[in-house]
Amino acid sequence: MKLETTRFGVIDIREEEVITMPLGMPGFSDQKQFVLLDHKPDSPFQWYQSVQDPSLAFVVTDPFLFKPDYAVNLHKIVEELGWDQDVSGNHLKLYAVVNIPPGSPEKTTANLIGPVLMNLVTHEAVQVIIPDSRYSHKFPLA
């Protein structure tokens, strides 16, 4: 399948690479399909590119790379979502949405209070809000 993007031009993706977000991203509820694209080889960042809007892409990262003791109660979230997969396995993946201020990459932050949780079996994802979190939506990465 051909995907037109403003950052990468036209790229080929496989249908099974498409991740469906039934609720969309907060503020972008009409955007329901995304694909993960690598930023650069060996980069800790990826692009979470909208399939529907060529100009919409979020920078995401594995939060454990920057906060090894990051802890989220996945069992509770998975139960609330009705996902039946074994959360102790490799069926789930968390991503933190990253904010890189223009001209100030040293002020890059990650949203640890609202990670994107992906179900790698069903190719579904949801941005969850961790209630009563000790984390910040502006966790410094630099």
Give the predicted meaning of each segment:
Residues 1-67, 89-142:
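Long, compositionally biased stretches
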Residues 69-76:
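Extended catalytic/binding region for NAD+/ADP-ribose chemistry, centered on the ART fold
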Residues 76-87:
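Short active-site loop/helix that positions an aromatic residue
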